[in-house]
């Protein structure tokens, strides 16, 4: 909670919100996105046999492209955060990543045994999202559980 605010901004700590297991709690929201991806990757390995060669050009949907673009901003975002000494910006960025992931996940079938190539490309997008979330959370000193 403290990391999600600027150093000079006023904070009224809400203990009920800190305990809340919903999207209203920013830490829970980020951890939930990571756990959701972990669960999806386990299901993928059960439902899809083998991995085809990767073809990321299959990712053409607006939500897929938006998420991929957001993930590509991570190195620049880290540079910005470190130069400004504002971890709040990393927290905000990670919330944007989690939100984009949830939108993508809600709108598209990631695991489709009838379309293994697209499923594999989407799996790779999910894996990249998990890496960004896990690394970002670690930098902020927040755990990234695989189950919730």
Indicate residue ranges for each PLM-predicted region.
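Non-catalytic interaction-recognition regions
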Residues: 1-148
């Amino acid at each position: 909670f403290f990391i999600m605010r600027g150093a000079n901004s006023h904070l009224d700590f809400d203990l009920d919100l800190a305990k809340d297991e919903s999207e209203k709690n920013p830490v829970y929201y980020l951890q939930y996105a990571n756990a959701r991806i972990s669960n999806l990757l386990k299901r993928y390995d059960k439902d899809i046999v083998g991995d085809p060669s990767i073809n990321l050009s299959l990712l053409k949907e607006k939500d897929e492209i938006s998420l991929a673009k957001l993930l590509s901003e991570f190195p620049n975002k880290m540079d910005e955060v470190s130069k400004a000494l504002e971890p709040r910006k990393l927290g905000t960025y990670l919330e944007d990543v989690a939100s984009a992931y949830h939108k993508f996940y809600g709108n598209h079938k990631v695991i489709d045994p009838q379309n293994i190539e697209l499923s594999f490309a989407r799996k790779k997008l999910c894996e990249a999202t998990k890496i960004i979330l896990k690394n970002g959370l670690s930098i902020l000193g927040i755990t990234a559980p695989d189950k919730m």
